[in-house]
């Protein structure tokens, strides 16, 4: 079985001191350095692999302090506070001994509770009825996704005019991969 490129990109190795090492992945390269979404996923993966983990991820806030360079990095994840069912995390990503990214995360044990969907899925065509976005994809990470735009998207021309911020699209991995949390 082939390992998905996303799983390769977030792969970490635990060190004796409790930190993790990893590497950026060429499939998720952006204009300068790696795509920020994979940087965020790498930070969260350090939490998910930590031996003190409680529960599943609820939230993640990422601060890109400096440009992440292509290559090796170190991640330090530590629980800042653990309660009965929630856990708060602080995460640092370092390259060459310098902090390039910080993050905070909250994990929790899921319990039976009430739920309410405050917003419903918009009425849109089925994915098969929307043509896939094609053309030049200058950044490698864009090539990892099957994007089917419905409304909005990147303006074809940067002319200074204002456009609606509404964007609707179908998005999935080019190489199929199940969602981690749905």
Regions inferred by a protein language model and the residue ranges of each:
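Terminal targeting signals and extreme-terminal segments of soluble enzymes
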Residues: 1-182
């Amino acid at each position: 079985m082939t390992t998905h490129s996303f799983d390769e990109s977030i792969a970490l190795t635990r060190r004796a001191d409790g930190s993790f090492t990893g590497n950026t992945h060429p499939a998720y390269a952006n204009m300068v350095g790696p795509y920020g979404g994979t940087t965020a996923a790498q930070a969260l993966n350090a939490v998910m692999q930590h031996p003190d983990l409680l529960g599943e991820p609820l939230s993640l806030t990422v601060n890109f302090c400096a440009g992440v360079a292509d290559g090796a990095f170190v991640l330090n994840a530590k629980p800042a506070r653990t309660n009965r069912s929630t856990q708060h995390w602080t995460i640092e990503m370092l390259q060459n001994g310098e902090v390039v990214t910080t993050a905070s995360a909250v994990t929790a044990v899921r319990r039976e509770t009430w739920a309410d969907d405050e917003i419903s899925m918009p009425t849109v065509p089925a994915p098969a009825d929307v043509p896939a976005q094609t053309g030049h994809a200058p950044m490698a990470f864009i090539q990892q996704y099957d994007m089917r735009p419905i409304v909005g998207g990147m303006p074809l021309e940067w002319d200074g005019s204002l456009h609606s911020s509404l964007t609707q699209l179908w998005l999935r991995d080019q190489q199929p991969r199940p969602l981690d949390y749905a």
